[in-house]
Amino acid sequence: MSLITAGRLCARILGAKNSPCALIAARQASSSANLKDVLSDLIPKEQTRIKNFRQQYGKNVIGQITVDMMYGGMRGMKGLVYETSVLDPDEGIRFRGYSIPECQKLLPKAPGGEEPLPEGLFWLLVTGEAPSQEQVNWISKEWAKRAALPSHVVTMLDNFPTNLHPMSQLSAAITALNSESNFARGYAEGVNKTKYWELIYEDSMDLIAKLPCVAAKIYRNLYREGSSIGAIDSNLDWSHNFTNMLGYTDPQFTELMRLYLTIHSDHEGGNVSAHTSHLVGSALSDPYLSFSAAMNGLAGPLHGLANQEVLVWLTSLQKDLGGEVSDEKLRDYIWNTLNSGRVVPGYGHAVLRKTDPRYTCQREFALKHLPNDPMFKLVAQLYKIVPNVLLEQGKAKNPWPNVDAHSGVLLQYYGMKEMNYYTVLFGVSRALGVLAQLIWSRALGFPLERPKSMSTDGLMQLVGSKSG
């Protein structure tokens, strides 16, 4: 999206003709295929734009904080600046202003492919501009060139016990990659802070390039008897190399991986993994340490393990009710789940109030490629029934399915049945969004994050309540 388009969008949202966003100068898509060169041109302009904005509007109040917000996980509290994506309760995620369907149409595809290449989304997240095919090809080759793992990380991965969770292995390996950090080395040598973003960029590009190798190594060691991941092919895209290293050769699975890695990449800045990387990065920890911390957050059952919980529930449902199930029996099963104090996994979202567009695009993929798969048919049947049951129950603010209601079913269909591994794929994808933002956080000089905390007694005193 050009800056002038973004400005018009912002002005429309804010309802102000003279909104600072509306004053942005027009910017054409950059012709250079080198992402760092494009950033070098964009960053000074954005620094000036934000400086002027803060000078004029820095004291403006943008919201109120309630006691419930402080006890309720800061839900709805506006407290972060996060550039790469915005989550709208009704529309879902927008990557630099573009919806998922728009990205599917706009972003370059692999030869003969129909799904967007994650490389294109990364370019969009970093620059705000939809890339050309040449620019996406440059990213693919750049990541292939940077993909090799240092020997100590390979040795580390090969010596992990097989009962160590894949996410623990991923986090540990990413932390160990910090030995390669350009930023950590440059900071120790006293590099000028105006150069921070350049070193963060180099580390982020290196880390994204290496993640499929780390993830594939974990998969092969745990589930394929330690067989080799093979070599990176510089003529293939990032997702294609990843699926090859995992050991999957079905072109449809590669297309699914392109879609999966694109749609799981970013979801605004307040979720656990994005906020964690932002917080840790604000201490000037390098991208390896920041992203490793984010992965520890993603490993939590309330964040990245949800797709695994969906499959466990679906498998249990099939076991209890058998193959084809009538709508009436399915409805009774859902009510039994709710009445026992449990939730229906894959339904509801902290922000969204309509069907997650990430669910919708996966459903469209399934309708095209696996319409008769029994598990997909069950998911489609649930889509017709669960929202109505949840509305009848009256507790759910959002009765609609989220991304996790579908992704595991697709992976299972193509033979990836190792549910413990699914969050690793989520983590590889999430690197695109949080590292794109980390580059901008350092370019814009965001300070150490340090909100004020209060005790319950302090809150009671503030609002005039008696603590006794």
Swiss-Prot record:
Localization in the cell: Mitochondrion matrix
InterPro entries linked to this entry: Citrate_synth-like_lrg_a-sub (IPR016142), Citrate_synth-like_sm_a-sub (IPR016143), Citrate_synthase (IPR002020), Citrate_synthase_AS (IPR019810), Citrate_synthase_euk (IPR010109), Citrate_synthase_sf (IPR036969)
Transit peptide start-stop: 1-30
Residues that bind oxaloacetate: 358, 430, 450
UniProt KW Membrane keyword: no
A Gene Ontology cellular-component term: mitochondrial matrix
Entry EC number(s): 2.3.3.1
One Pfam family here: Citrate_synt
CDD domains, per the entry: ScCit1-2_like (cd06105)
Organism superkingdom: Eukaryota
NCBIfam families registered for this protein in UniProt: cit_synth_euk, PRK09569.1
Protein family per UniProt: Belongs to the citrate synthase family.
Subunit structure: Homodimer.
Name of this protein: Citrate synthase, mitochondrial
Gene it is expressed from: cs
